[in-house]
Amino acid sequence: MWDLGRELAHRGHTVTIIGGVGQRREPAPGVRVLMFPFINRYRFQALPLLRRAYAEAKLLERLSMAIAALPELISGGYDIIHIQKPYDLGPALLARRFGGARVVLGCHGEDFYPGDTLLAPHVDAAVSCSRFNARTVAARYGFEPTVVFNGIDTSLFRPVAPNPDIVRPADGAPLLLWVGRLQPWKGVDVAIRAIQDIPQTHLMIVGDGETRADLERLAQGLGLAERVHFLGALPRKRLPSIYAAADLLLATSFASETFGIGLVEAQACGLPVVASRFGGFPEVIDEGRTGLLVPPRDPAALAAAVRALLDDPARRRAMAAAAPGWAAQFSWSAVADRVEAAYRAACNGKI
């Protein structure tokens, strides 16, 4: 919302971002930020009845903030209240009832909970981050959201010089890249196993998370410790030069991926992608032109696709040249155009 808020403020809209007390970025000119206290979801999950009830605990966390924020939502004179998850439906609809604001529901995942189906039909407009996500939302709520892709900062993510700290293999071997949180459904093990079938190729893994130790043991056990390099989590501002140092980006998720922001950022930097044909990934790749798609959880298919591109440098260069132009549709300016259209639909009562 920070980047979208900046773009909307630049267009002359009066923008307020409301969130919980915590770390904050410096807001853009014209963007007001209000922070309210909340009760962390983990405190709710400490209660025996909520120990395994993530959605309900998250709902209570958001409601605890909404109690403090509700007077502002009602009396703030807002034309549009754009919520980012269904958890905020109740407070937003109260503000609609008593303050007159129109409510736009943003959906980026499957953040559903008991009772949300009673509230969602009362919003004025809804947006989803991909067609994949829109189908999920439509199946639950009975209406089709407008697809508004997530955005990227194209002033940051663009072709740049390679990071000088990334040392290419001395033998000139290809360098593959994986970027993201190390979690079970991200399928990083698939990328590591695929390396077995791509001789001399090296894999850089940027990110950290709960599966890192297991992945390091896997690489060691497969005899790939010298070819799989764990760089840990890096600041986003360093990623463009990391993308520039690689030959291909691998994206191997098999669950919980409604978009694929890292794939878009890589393409904006001129890096072709080989990704799972899953979730929102097929929507953010121009298949055959900026990257390839393979079946999820299939190391052999991933290795074959990577080899096909590594063995065809001309095709890979053509993909690299086409990728930034394709990624331009995900700029915050383009996203703001679609969001403004959704806001106009909300004001006209067209969901």
Regions found by a protein language model. Give the residues of each.
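Short His-centered aromatic/hydrophobic patch
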Residues: 61-62, 83-88, 107
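Nucleotide-activated donor-binding/catalytic signature segment of Leloir-type glycosyltransferases, i.e.
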Residues: 98, 216-234
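Carbohydrate-associated surface elements
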Residues: 132, 151
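A conserved mid-protein helix/loop that constitutes part of the nucleotide-sugar donor-binding site
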Residues: 174, 178-197, 210-216, 292, ...
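Acidic donor-binding loop of glycosyltransferase active sites
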Residues: 227, 244-258, 271
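Short alpha-helical donor nucleotide-sugar binding micro-motif in glycosyltransferases
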Residues: 233-234, 241-246
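Short hydrophobic beta-strand element within catalytic cores of glycosyltransferases
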Residues: 272-275, 285
